[in-house]
């Protein structure tokens, strides 16, 4: 029976007891509601045993201390009162641990996150291993929550208000050396001596609190309630600017710290429990948690049921441009798989190597990586202008121009030069994969692998299967994309696939509003306020106006008139406006451009636009996004995407659809299909059939159905 316990206490001869946490049957430790009584029972036992002179809290898992609280228990909360009780139970247990008269040391190896760090903060001292898997942080904000186990109170008292706010508001994870420098841990040692170091610390007894390590200016600002309020007000302004008021958690985190530092820890904990409960029941946190569960669930899937992925040991990338260089870079850096880049020009190859080197060198400059580690990764990337050294390539990723004839030649070259099982993966952004596979003698090996730019930053890839792509090819490509650190969604073949298809209508509508006289900066601000990371005009400048102009005719030809792009694109290209890449777009670039982004007013003249009065921001955002919602449902209707879940993940990770809304499908459930259909029909009467609601939405409006169960 004792084997089934999570917490086990072992007494040593030297008077130090070891409390080992090891959740049975799970790879990582997470804190669960039912652990409270078990911990309290052990703490009572410790208090009653005078032979115990010190306590070390350690994990029984090889690679993690505690990865956080088990967030599935939050879904069971039916109201704020129940959620508040969860937080308060954590407060009681951690206060009991902190209140022990003997020294308590946390011995940390691996992930120490969320409730795990709060557990460590309740200990009197902390020592962590220097292992690369050891990371400390409070990432609750990423789930629309706040640290509800006393973290908002203990963390600022340990590392200072400014540092604590930075950790809690970003959810960033701290490496061991950084944790030592900021005073979050008392020592960093190799994992082999972690336990003994913690034992020695416990033997030394409780130590006087060290002064918080911080700059003179922060010392001054944190010294009185008046100056502390300057920090809180500044933090609040920055948060509001960043979140546009769409995420309630950051403001509540600031309030918890403010109240606790100004009115004492008891008040702070009370506020923390109240705010935590409010956030647990918020629609924003529900959406973010659903996204977390969806991506976790997706990681277990192969993309093709029953298929076993082949091992990928060598990769070739065709094309040394920005996309090719980025793909080769994530292959070597993240997947640690050798990549050979082929380009017709030495300059292209040089650019690809330089691109990868600069990305790695950033890590060296930030001390996240040694120069030797950088050079070892660079050694995995080789280049060629011919088809040499690729006979044993398992995957060839093609990243050349959007030209069907050129891609046909690439397929034939690869089939001639490589083995019969080599996968040909095209990074096309718009050409149907079936058309590319038409030139193949082994079409079952041809697949789409659509990355988003910049490759090293954008988390999504679309894995596109055409009608005869083999399940093994799909599974191997999905597994390869995951090794690159990507979130892959499997979509079926069709012009624009999923992400670019829903994005095109959004961009077209923004361009239409521009031609109607809406100012560029007003359009961008309206969509940023709605929750997108950047506005549509900024995005078009970044992606390239020429790229947008190339994709639109393909989509119009394959999918119909609703994809017809406004005449703006042709006029812009005639004026040689491609966006940031050539320093000429909707905004000013180059040395003349100031730090604050300024619109290039000459665009209005090029497009013969007469500036009109600003339409209401909400109306602008609605008109741009409503077609995206409609088209996402069409993609599900046509089988382009397999599920609403995949559609939500694709939109959030591919184009930055506001995460707090949960994705297009979850947002439609929030709006209600009948309301959405009525709004679409209203726009249809004003602007034409491009706003006609799709059949599935009309059916859902009549029968009241939803994509997700309540």
From Swiss-Prot:
The keyword Cytoplasm applies. Pathway: Lipid metabolism; fatty acid beta-oxidation. Residues 310-710 are annotated as: 3-hydroxyacyl-CoA dehydrogenase. Residues 1-190 are annotated as: Enoyl-CoA hydratase. It catalyses: a (3S)-3-hydroxyacyl-CoA = a (2E)-enoyl-CoA + H2O; a 4-saturated-(3S)-3-hydroxyacyl-CoA = a (3E)-enoyl-CoA + H2O; a (3S)-3-hydroxyacyl-CoA + NAD(+) = a 3-oxoacyl-CoA + NADH + H(+); (3S)-3-hydroxybutanoyl-CoA = (3R)-3-hydroxybutanoyl-CoA. Its main location: cytoplasm. GO terms for cellular component: cytoplasm. The record marks 118, 140 as: Important for catalytic activity. GO terms for molecular function: 3-hydroxybutyryl-CoA epimerase activity; enoyl-CoA hydratase activity; long-chain-3-hydroxyacyl-CoA dehydrogenase activity; NAD+ binding. Keywords: Cytoplasm, Fatty acid metabolism, Isomerase, Lipid degradation, Lipid metabolism, Lyase, Multifunctional enzyme, NAD, Oxidoreductase. It comes from the Bacteria. Pfam families: 3HCDH, 3HCDH_N, ECH_1. SUPFAM superfamilies: 6-phosphogluconate dehydrogenase C-terminal domain-like (SSF48179), ClpP/crotonase (SSF52096), NAD(P)-binding Rossmann-fold domains (SSF51735). It is found in: Cytoplasm. InterPro entries: 3-OHacyl-CoA_DH_NAD-bd, 3HC_DH_C, 6-PGluconate_DH-like_C_sf, ClpP/crotonase-like_dom_sf, Enoyl-CoA_hyd/isom_CS, Enoyl-CoA_hydra/iso, FA_oxidation_alpha_subunit, FadJ. CDD domains: crotonase-like. Its EC number is 4.2.1.17, 5.1.2.3, 1.1.1.35. One of its GO terms (biological process) is fatty acid beta-oxidation. The keyword Thylakoid does not apply. NCBIfam families: FadJ, PRK11154.1. Catalyzes the formation of a hydroxyacyl-CoA by addition of water on enoyl-CoA. Also exhibits 3-hydroxyacyl-CoA epimerase and 3-hydroxyacyl-CoA dehydrogenase activities. PANTHER family: TRIFUNCTIONAL ENZYME SUBUNIT ALPHA (PTHR43612), TRIFUNCTIONAL ENZYME SUBUNIT ALPHA, MITOCHONDRIAL (PTHR43612:SF3). In the N-terminal section; belongs to the enoyl-CoA hydratase/isomerase family. In the central section; belongs to the 3-hydroxyacyl-CoA dehydrogenase family. Heterotetramer of two alpha chains (FadJ) and two beta chains (FadI). This is Fatty acid oxidation complex subunit alpha. The lineage of its organism: Bacteria, Pseudomonadati, Pseudomonadota, Gammaproteobacteria, Alteromonadales.
